[in-house]
Amino acid sequence: MKISKESVRRKAFRFALITSALMAIPMSSLADIAVKDGEKIAFLGDSITQAGARPNGYVRLAIRGLESAGVKTTAIPAGISGHKSNQMLARLERDVLSKKPNWMTLSCGVNDVWHGKRGVSLEDYKVNITRIVDHCQSAGVKVMILTSTMIGEDKGNANNKKLSTYNDFLRELAREKKCLLADLNADMR
């Protein structure tokens, strides 16, 4: 089954709104993870995150969503096109931790998979992502993990099948490390 580009855009927009709302809701079960007024949010990722820093990208939409809920935050855009988990780990200190965020969203996986032989194996991906989360949590940064969206519009292509194992790991890691999870891939399976 093919999914249109417009459908993917709607899902990304919906994600930004849901993410910002979820991060702002001061419910008792979320009280210890809700974004507070004045906090900084780093957005670590690849080209999707880099484009998210544009005026109508998901980084700006999330910040505007929080503002509409009365929560003023500062964005730290840290997306670089083409980057994989190993590159994000290598620049984590410089691009994220040195800026002392309270929160970090992590969007990583598409390039690890679809770059083929230049990609990152599932085993190495698990090590890289776990280290990123561990470094952030050791620095007192709360982490929201985003599962990766589809590669192309065909759910059944080989890359999407491979990506599903990476996303399964992210879901498992979020539970294990008590990270917030935005399961962007849930509706695309």
Question: What is the predicted role of each segment?
Answer:
Residues M1-L44, I48-N56, I63-K72, L97-N102:
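N-terminal secretory targeting modules
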Residues V35-D37, R60-T74, Q87-R189:
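Alpha-helical cap/lid subdomain in secreted, periplasmic
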Residues F43-L44, P77, I145:
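A structural signal for the hydrophobic beta-strands that form the central parallel beta-sheet
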Residues D46, I80, S148:
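Cofactor-binding loop segments of dinucleotide-utilizing enzymes, especially the Rossmann-like FAD-
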Residues Q50, K84, V113:
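Glycine-/small-residue-rich active-site loops that bind phosphorylated ligands and cofactors
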Residues P77-K84:
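Short beta->alpha junction loops
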